[in-house]
Amino acid sequence: MTATLSNFLWSIFWGGVVVALGAAALTAISRIDRIR
């Protein structure tokens, strides 16, 4: 595996992590707003 390919895969991995965290945060916020 070349360094470029490795960096590309890591960028995709962290991109997915960020998106997942963002979605989880939005879901939590929407649930909190509904409780109120």
Curated annotation (Swiss-Prot):
Lipid bilayer topology? Single-pass membrane protein
Primary localisation category? membrane
What does the sequence similarity comment in the record state about its family?
Belongs to the PsbX family. Type 1 subfamily.
A cellular component term (GO) from this record?
A: photosystem II
HAMAP family attached to this UniProt entry: PSII_PsbX_1
Q: Does the keyword Transferase apply?
A: no
Gene Ontology biological process terms from the UniProt entry:
photosynthesis
Regions crossing the membrane: 9-29
Q: Subunit notes for this chain?
A: PSII is composed of 1 copy each of membrane proteins PsbA, PsbB, PsbC, PsbD, PsbE, PsbF, PsbH, PsbI, PsbJ, PsbK, PsbL, PsbM, PsbT, PsbX, Psb30/Ycf12, peripheral proteins PsbO, CyanoQ (PsbQ), PsbU, PsbV and a large number of cofactors. It forms dimeric complexes.
Q: Which UniProt keywords apply?
A: Cell inner membrane, Cell membrane, Membrane, Photosynthesis, Photosystem II, Transmembrane, Transmembrane helix
Recorded hits in InterPro entries, A to Z, give:
PSII_PsbX, PSII_PsbX_type_1_subfam
Is Repeat one of the keywords UniProt gives this record?
Answer: no
Stated role: Involved in the binding and/or turnover of quinones at the Q(B) site of photosystem II (PSII). PSII is a light-driven water plastoquinone oxidoreductase, using light energy to abstract electrons from H(2)O, generating a proton gradient subsequently used for ATP formation.
Organism, as annotated: Gloeobacter violaceus (strain ATCC 29082 / PCC 7421)
> What is this protein called in UniProt?
Photosystem II reaction center protein X
Where in or outside the cell it occurs: the entry states: Cell inner membrane
Which Gene3D superfamilies does this entry report, sorted A to Z? Single helix bin
